[in-house]
Amino acid sequence: MKIKNSLKSLKARHRDNRLVRRKGRMYIINKLNPRFKARQG
């Protein structure tokens, strides 16, 4: 999982990326291709 300050550019890397908020943190999840996972940090 990548840790990035800004997730906007990471969201554009794959069309199936979803931006979700869990426990006050923003995550990028991708069910089809899990290597695009990221967390804002």
UniProtKB/Swiss-Prot annotation:
NCBIfam families assigned: PRK00831.1
Any one GO cellular component localisation term in the record: ribonucleoprotein complex
SUPFAM superfamilies in the record: Ribosomal protein L36 (SSF57840)
GO biological process entries: translation
GO MF term list: structural constituent of ribosome
Cross-referenced HAMAP family: Ribosomal_bL36
Similarity comment: Belongs to the bacterial ribosomal protein bL36 family.
Name of the protein described by the UniProt record: Large ribosomal subunit protein bL36
Coiled coil: none
Keywords, comma-separated and alphabetical: Ribonucleoprotein, Ribosomal protein
Pfam name, any one: Ribosomal_L36
UniProt source species: Rhizobium rhizogenes (strain K84 / ATCC BAA-868)
